[in-house]
Amino acid sequence: MSNNITSITRQLIADEIETSKISICGKLNDAEFLNRIFDLEQLPSQDKRYKTAFGDISCHSRFGDYETITWMFNDSRFNLLHCNDELFIRFICETLNPAVMHKQEDLDKLKAIYSRYLRGDGYELYIRYNISSMPIYGVRKIETGIDIQEKSIQQYLDSEYVLSKVNLMKSMVKTNTDLALGSAKELLEIVC
């Protein structure tokens, strides 16, 4: 799967979150948050005192050992700057999840940051559904005018539509030649 959300966009998102000082983990600690996306018990520790990433990250986040809020973007275990789009989108959506983010002000700031940069790569945030009257966000490809036009053309190329136009032309040839010719011209313009 190719990445449509570029590493430039991802870095811009990380940089603005860092500048804004928004805790992307919300009310969870770093390990609890990341464990919602990755199985930290299966990932290696970068500290020989711990067997797994969960213990490593729990300890280091508890004692404030990470220099930046967005350290996880540059951690090779998560590869957020270069992972596939599906994983990156999951990460973004978890930061907006009501089980994670409890401050409306931070939620609004994150939504604005994500929307601003994702739009450049042709994506947008949207509300997938609600739980307990709270939105669960998703990210989707923005349909451009060309995409919409393509769907419209595909509808006209549907064999049922073409057949209905051909039948109309056949039935009108003897009784209303102008209508038959107009239908033929319309069909040709749509197809070509």
PLM features: residue spans?
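Short, hydrophobic, well-ordered secondary-structure elements
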Residues: 166-170, 174-192
